[in-house]
Regions:
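Conserved beta-strand-loop-beta-strand hairpin that lines the nucleotide-binding pocket
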Residues: 1-6, 51-132
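Short active-site loops of ABC-family nucleotide-binding domains
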Residues: 48
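Conserved short strand/loop->alpha-helix "switch" segment adjacent to the catalytic nucleotide/phosphoryl-transfer site
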Residues: 17-44
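Pocket-edge positions in alpha/beta enzyme catalytic cores
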Residues: 8-11, 31, 91
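STAS-typified acidic loop motif
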Residues: 6-20
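Short, functional N-terminal and low-complexity linear motifs
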Residues: 9, 25-28, 38, 64-69
Length: 132
């Protein structure tokens, strides 16, 4: 079963909170609320990157797969994200590190129409599988 939900937004800081709320509603609707925390963390980082670095309108897409959720963020900036070495005293640069920690896999690729697609897949068990 594959379900999906999409949000298109302007590059405003409010879009990060709007995206978090979408994750919460969607994960509950999909009976996957046990995975809400890692999916929310990844969405917040990828959307914040789109808002801060791309500064273009973006599209967030959540896709439910068998036991996982795929997060996709498309924007119009061609620069791909980089996983940097974590610097303990740095004020930034932790976004993709967090994505790398939470996701079973992630990547970024140029979009055919320009810009890029950044994606992450997160293993998530349905609530019934965890409870029983």
């Amino acid at each position: 079963m594959y379900d999906e939900t999409t949000l298109r937004a302007a590059p405003l800081t409010e879009a990060v909170e709007q995206s978090r709320r979408l994750v919460a509603r969607t994960m509950r609707a999909w009976n996957m609320s046990a995975g809400e925390e890692p999916v929310t963390a990844i969405v917040a980082e990828l959307v914040a990157n789109a808002v801060t670095h791309a500064a273009t309108p973006f599209e967030l897409r959540l896709v439910r797969g068998e036991g996982h959720v795929r997060v996709e963020v498309r924007d119009r900036d061609h620069r791909l994200p980089v996983l940097r070495d974590l610097q303990p005293l740095s004020d930034g640069g932790r976004g993709m590190f967090l994505v790398d920690c939470y996701a079973r896999s992630w990547g970024a690729e140029p979009a055919p129409d320009g810009g890029k697609l950044v994606w992450a897949e997160i293993d998530v068990a349905p609530r019934a599988a965890i409870a029983g």
